[in-house]
């Protein structure tokens, strides 16, 4: 080489020989510097191919002849591949990775993966210096990157799945605890809402424990609930006189609602109470045995009203006119009796002022004329009636009293009457009275004017389909369809549910009723 400058004087020349025909193939083994590979410590090394992927490239072995063989299967398979452009990759052992073991089983393991495309655009050579100082250059055939293998035991698929589930549990522990806190907060809020609902007005339609109590929200249901507890006490106590009833009106209590109601509102309840007490066939012999002694003594209010109603019904129109004339012109004896009865009523008012008007039955009787108050045992309704009673008031309540009397007679003789006569008596008073509260007795249907009837069969059918709340049942029996008021529908449903005794379940903090088929 020619000297180009003072720096070129130290240049040395080397001879590089490249062999034309080489039987050996040279490959490069590349290790990462972080692995800290030290060849000086290698006492033993073993290098072998990893042929575990051979099964992937193997084709299914099918018999060419005999059972299970197909005619020209290989030719047809090749034609199919050419049609769809499928190119099969052959299994080439030289392309498989290397496995390097250093210093036996206890040593390290490396896996060398072939680096593709290294020799496509570049050429790598390995230079070896010969004894004469010249270099021999051998071309690099392949390049392998070696990475160390993990020494610890790897997990199987099942073990890995178990570990993954455990990992999810650990990671989700915080979220689970957070959900619990939120649930506790929701429960506290629900309890507060329940307390608030309990403090609300009783205007909501709800049916509580059917076995113990039927506490309905409407005023009519409250009145019917009070009737059951108050009527037995009313039997023992004498009714109050007219003066006591006037004072009660002045008090302005809740009972004023009953004063403003129409005629016949409590007719159904009166009949139920009276029929329950007198229609049982077992009590009839006892009452017959005691009848001679009781008839001689003073009669009670109910018996007097029954006898007076019977006498009124049996009288022809002419006798009614005569009775009215006699009322207008009172005799001196009647005046004397009237004074005695007023004194008795004042004394009874003072003695029984604490327990006045405890029954819905006597509330309903407030509309009746005062001639049916306390009477002597031998006197009739005509002799003890007060002359000052207006005739319009007696005419307005006559239909209600007649209906009550007929139903009382029906309850007393229910075991003796035939079915046809009983049916006639049932339908008669209802046509006379203006309104009547529907009470479902032993039968399954209730009389109503609408298309849909609130019957026990209908309620059973709804409850056997799916659990329902009382609100859902009230939606099924709407007032437009049944022809009943909301209070009447609530009463009928309450009695039907009490009779069916369905199962109760709490779903979303709401009481649901259901029946099994």
From Swiss-Prot:
It is found in: Nucleus. Phosphorylated on Ser and other residues by TAF1 and casein kinase II-like kinases. Residues 428-452 have a biased composition (Polar residues). GO terms for biological process: negative regulation of protein binding; positive regulation of transcription by RNA polymerase II; positive regulation of transcription elongation by RNA polymerase II; response to virus; transcription by RNA polymerase II; transcription elongation by RNA polymerase II; transcription initiation at RNA polymerase II promoter. Residues 232-251, 364-374 have a biased composition (Basic residues). Gene3D superfamilies: Winged helix-like DNA-binding domain superfamily/Winged helix DNA-binding domain. Residues 178-466 are annotated as: Disordered. It comes from the Eukaryota. Pfam families: TFIIF_alpha. Zn(2+) binds at residues 503, 512, 517. Keywords: Acetylation, DNA-binding, Nucleus, Phosphoprotein, Transcription, Transcription regulation. GO terms for cellular component: cell junction; intracellular membrane-bounded organelle; nucleoplasm; nucleus; protein-containing complex; transcription factor TFIID complex; transcription factor TFIIF complex. The modification Phosphoserine is found at residues 217-218, 221, 224, 377, 380-381, 385, 391, 431, 433, 436, 449. The modification N-acetylalanine is found at residue 2. The keyword DNA-binding applies. The modification Phosphothreonine is found at residues 156, 331, 389, 437, 446. The keyword DNA-binding applies. Induction: Up-regulated in response to enterovirus 71 (EV71) infection. One of its GO terms (molecular function) is RNA polymerase II general transcription initiation factor binding. The modification N6-acetyllysine is found at residue 407. Residues 377-391 have a biased composition (Low complexity). TFIIF is a general transcription initiation factor that binds to RNA polymerase II and helps to recruit it to the initiation complex in collaboration with TFIIB. It promotes transcription elongation. Heterodimer of an alpha and a beta subunit. Interacts with GTF2F2, CTDP1, TAF6/TAFII80 and URI1. Interacts with GTF2B (via C-terminus and preferentially via acetylated form); this interaction prevents binding of GTF2B to GTF2F2. Belongs to the TFIIF alpha subunit family. This is General transcription factor IIF subunit 1. It comes from Homo sapiens (Human).
């Amino acid at each position: 080489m020619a000297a180009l400058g003072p720096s070129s004087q130290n240049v040395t020349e080397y001879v590089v020989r490249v062999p034309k025909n080489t039987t050996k193939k040279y490959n490069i083994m590349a290790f990462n510097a972080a692995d800290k590979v030290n060849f000086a410590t290698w006492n033993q090394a073993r290098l072998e191919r990893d042929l575990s992927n051979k099964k992937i490239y193997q084709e299914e072995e099918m018999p060419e002849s005999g059972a299970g063989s197909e005619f020209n299967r290989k030719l047809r398979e090749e034609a199919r591949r050419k049609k769809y452009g499928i190119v099969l990759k052959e299994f080439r052992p030289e392309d498989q990775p290397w496995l390097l073991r250093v210093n036996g089983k206890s040593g390290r393991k490396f896996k060398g993966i072939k680096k593709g495309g290294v020799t496509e655009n570049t050429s790598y050579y390995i230079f070896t210096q010969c004894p004469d100082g010249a270099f021999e250059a051998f071309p690099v055939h392949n390049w392998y990157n070696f990475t160390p293998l993990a020494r610890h035991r790897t997990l199987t698929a099942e073990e890995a799945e178990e570990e993954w589930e455990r990992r999810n549990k650990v990671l989700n522990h915080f979220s689970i605890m957070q959900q619990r806190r939120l649930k506790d907060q929701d429960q506290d809020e629900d309890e507060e809402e329940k307390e608030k609902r309990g403090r609300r007005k009783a205007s909501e339609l709800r049916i509580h424990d059917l076995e113990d109590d039927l506490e309905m929200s409407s005023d009519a249901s409250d009145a019917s609930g009070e009737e059951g507890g108050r009527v037995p006490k009313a039997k023992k106590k004498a009714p109050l006189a007219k003066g006591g009833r006037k004072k009660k009106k002045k008090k302005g209590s809740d009972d004023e609602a009953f004063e403003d109601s129409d005629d016949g509102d409590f007719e159904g309840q009166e009949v139920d109470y009276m029929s329950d007490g007198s229609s049982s066939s077992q009590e009839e012999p006892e009452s017959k045995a005691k009848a001679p002694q009781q008839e001689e003594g003073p009669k009670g209010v109910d018996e007097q009203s029954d006898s007076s109603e019977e006498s009124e019904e049996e009288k022809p129109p002419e006798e009614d006119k005569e009775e009215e004339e006699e009322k207008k012109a009172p005799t001196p004896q009647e005046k004397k009796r009237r004074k005695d009865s007023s004194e008795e009523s004042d004394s009874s008012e003072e003695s029984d002022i604490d327990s006045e008007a405890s029954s819905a039955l006597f509330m309903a009787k407030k509309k009746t004329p005062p001639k049916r108050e306390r009477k002597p045992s031998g006197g009739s309704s005509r002799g003890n009636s007060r002359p000052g009673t207006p005739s319009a008031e007696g005419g307005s309540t006559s239909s209600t009293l007649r209906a009550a009397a007929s139903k009382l007679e029906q309850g007393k003789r229910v075991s003796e009457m035939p079915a046809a006569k009983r049916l006639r008596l049932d339908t008669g008073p209802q046509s006379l009275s203006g309104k009547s509260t529907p009470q479902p007795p032993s039968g399954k249907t209730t009389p109503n004017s609408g298309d849909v009837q609130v019957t026990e069969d209908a309620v059973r059918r709804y409850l056997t389909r799916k659990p329902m709340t009382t609100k859902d049942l009230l939606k099924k029996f709407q007032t437009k369809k049944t022809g009943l008021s909301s209070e009447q529908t609530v009463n009928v449903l309450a009695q039907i549910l009490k009779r069916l005794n369905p199962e109760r379940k709490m779903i979303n903090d709401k009481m649901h009723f259901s029946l099994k088929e």
